[in-house]
Amino acid sequence: MDILIISLKSLGYSRTHKSLDSGPLVVHAVAGAGKSTALRKLILRHPTFTVHTLGVPDKVSIRTRGIQKPGPIPEGNFAILDEYTLDNTTRNSYQALFADPYQAPEFSLEPHFYLETSFRVPRKVADLIAGCGFDFETNSQEEGHLEITGIFKGPLLGKVIAIDEESETTLSKHGVEFVKPCQVTGLEFKVVTVVSAAPIEEIGQSTAFYNAITRSKGLTYVRAGT
């Protein structure tokens, strides 16, 4: 565990007051904070670590084991579970739990370490996320492209993500192909359009909105309200 804690501190994670003797090590980080990248480097440098995820696993590689689906843990290895908040029945076999609690807050635990800074999310999008009530900031130098209009006052471009049932119904009636936020967890797209039946000022601290808008790594469009 010492290697992991040293790594977290070097990456800028902040320590809470929770005792390290209380259960598995819990680590929280916002979208784009480099959590998965840090875990990949950890298992590449230290073969005694095993990392599983309840999200999207890495593709098979000849260079490294990568982040895998939950399965057997080699005897003596330090086991880490990423995206632990997606299920509360799988975590007992692991010594450390990682997640972005904003993606599934109902199953989140009190953390030992946390990181509120993204390195991927553009400034305009980060400001919008923070304005919706999330503790979120970014170190990205990209201003980014963010456009906010009513649902039918702008084109629906790229990956269209509907964040509520009313917007799903509206898009279906017009024959628009879309996905739900839960279908794109851990994925990123160059162009994303987030569709909400409620206007942007009424969305608030919505898990669905957070999951949707943080999938964009390029052009971001929000079609909210009428």
From Swiss-Prot:
Highest taxon of the lineage: Viruses
UniProt keyword list: Host cytoplasm, Host-virus interaction, Inhibition of host innate immune response by virus, RNA-binding, Suppressor of RNA silencing, Transport, Viral immunoevasion, Viral movement protein
Cellular component per GO, a single term: cytoplasmic viral factory
Any one GO biological process: transport of virus in host, cell to cell
Domain (+)RNA virus helicase C-terminal as annotated: residue spans: 116-226
Record's keyword annotation contains Transport: yes
MF terms in GO: ATP binding; RNA binding
Occurrences of domain (+)RNA virus helicase ATP-binding (ranges): 1-115
Main localisation: host cell
Residues annotated as transmembrane: none
Miscellaneous comment text of the record: TGBp1, TGBp2 and TGBp3 seem to act together for cell-to-cell propagation. TGBp1 is the main movement protein that physically cross the plasmodesma with the viral genome. TGBp2 and TGBp3 would facilitate TGBp1 function.
Protein name: Movement and silencing protein TGBp1
